[in-house]
Amino acid sequence: MGKVIGIDLGTTNSCVAVMDGKTPKVIENAEGMRTTPSIVAFSDDGERLVGQPAKRQAVTNPERTIFAVKRLIGRRYDDPTVEKDKQLVPYKIAKAGNGDAWVEADGKTYSPSQISAFTLQKMKETAEAHLGQKVDQAVITVPAYFNDAQRQATKDAGKIAGLEVLRIINEPTAAALAYGLDKSKAGTIAVYDLGGGTFDVSVLEIGDGVFEVKSTNGDTFLGGEDFDMRLVNYLADEFQKEQGINLRNDKLALQRLKEAAEKAKIELSSTTQTEINLPFITADQSGPKHLTMKLTRAKFEALVDDLVQKTIEPCRKALKDAGLTAGEIGEVVLVGGMTRMPKVQEVVKQLFGKEPHKGVNPDEVVAIGAAIQAGVLQGDVKDVLLLDVTPLSLGIETLGGVFTRIIDRNTTIPTKKSQVFSTAEDNQNAVTIRVFQGEREMAADNKILGQFDLMGIPPAPRGMPQIEVTFDIDANGIVNVSAKDKATGKEQQIRIQASGGLSEADIEKMVKDAEANAAEDKKRREAVDAKNQADSLVHSTEKALTEHGSKIEESERRAIEDAVSDLKEALKGDDAEAIKAKTNTLAQASMKLGEAMYKQQAEADAAKDAAKDDVVDAEFTEVDDDKKSA
């Protein structure tokens, strides 16, 4: 078994690590950096750039430089958060055929999974160059609050990159593994993870090598990108006030602003004032314009204060779900580059009543945790048990479209729970079990994961049959849902992967289409099947006529040609029955042609057998190699 690597696939930066004996090690990329920008660009000559080379040319190539694609992964195009992103990025976000949000470059569309896969490929190559061997297995981290579709899309990205994803683990859990691996002291910790695009908070109990997640919460659309955009908008507004020019209309200027905003944000974590200097940012009739501005830490903190405050409520919810007070948390571990910001550290200190722990590298700790988990799966790391939780409730749709929870959020996995339901109508002989994930009270407001039918329920008054629905989630997050009629013992089940399986978009489309057009779907499918069969028969018959038409009677040949013409005419329409009838007619008519072909084949085989009888035997003498070379 080759090495299993751990990858932190981040919104802004990605990182790869591997177990070196008993120690996790972060691997430097080809540019000598320990983290790689999660940026993919397409150059004029069609070359694909990933990481630092892509970031370097972003200013001159804004429309073909894709960044922060993790914010789109597993999301629908009409999602309000995607709508918000469309206003902020210089590249084009397009609507895919299945309704998902994709990106466009050079007239070609890419799914967020594909773009993420290019970054994962870079991580894979980085690890292979370091290890000197092929790598095809990985543990990849995701925000704890990612839903099923987002986890599946991340797994798909791994597959596209040529990696078998052995496990998807939550970023705060990975950070806790890295933090607590060498700690002998038991305790309760909170992991506060504010990254480039997402925010997570998890409460864990650590002791004797057991890492047990008690609760998790977060916001999958809150991170460093939002802080950058606040500053970009402020700079654009100030410039417009001074010069009367809106820089947002100039994609090249917008990209320069973004780069300057990110640099200023980083500098203000260690200094109280910075200067933004962008010469020749734009021009008008009077000549070139320059942007020069001093920015204080206080001003920046005022601009982003509400974003920092948005992290407080998820922390409170996580504490409440864990049944703990802030005072009962022994240590707060900071993860993600944004936690270097003094204002963030101040808010964390106020909330938990203690100085946060800064002993881990916030950019690398998640990848290190992923490598440790890879080591556990590989058997290199002993005596470590990771007990994670399901971040969102799982349940089914019941009468009136209500979402009935069977497994609550923050339940430790693996787990198995059952509940008994009944029929809604008299003499109902089948029930449809629709499986959902989420926290809303109505099923339609949550994410659908799949559906299946339990048939053959004996006729009985409504409310009498007893149908037991069981949810079973294993340590991989794989969900099995079964429904059993207690009277007959009949059982039906569906297997859904909480970090795999069908994507939400595909299922949603299938379910909605099937509900609205069940009969139409059947008719359309039959027509397509009939057309395919007919097309194939027309093609093979015409080919056979060309090759063997001379071997049959003229009247038989004409009958076949007429049947072909009739079927071609029928194929112009969508009447499945007419196409089937004409297909049968052609099949019958062309039987004579088939007979002629088989007859010819039989004659050819007989001739071959006769020829074999005339084969002359010959003797061969083996020549020794040594003699040959002598």
Swiss-Prot record:
Compositionally biased region (Basic and acidic residues): 516-529, 540-558
Pfam families: HSP70 (PF00012)
Region Disordered: start-end pairs: 516-558
Alphabetical list of PROSITE patterns matching this protein: HSP70_1 (PS00297), HSP70_2 (PS00329), HSP70_3 (PS01036)
GO molecular function: ATP binding; ATP-dependent protein folding chaperone; unfolded protein binding
Keywords, comma-separated and alphabetical: ATP-binding, Chaperone, Nucleotide-binding, Phosphoprotein, Stress response
Family the entry assigns: Belongs to the heat shock protein 70 family.
Function of the protein: Acts as a chaperone.
UniProt xrefs under HAMAP family: DnaK (MF_00332)
PANTHER family, A to Z: HEAT SHOCK PROTEIN 70KDA
Protein name: Chaperone protein DnaK
Organism from which the protein derives: Nitrobacter winogradskyi (strain ATCC 25391 / DSM 10237 / CIP 104748 / NCIMB 11846 / Nb-255)
Designated gene of the protein: dnaK
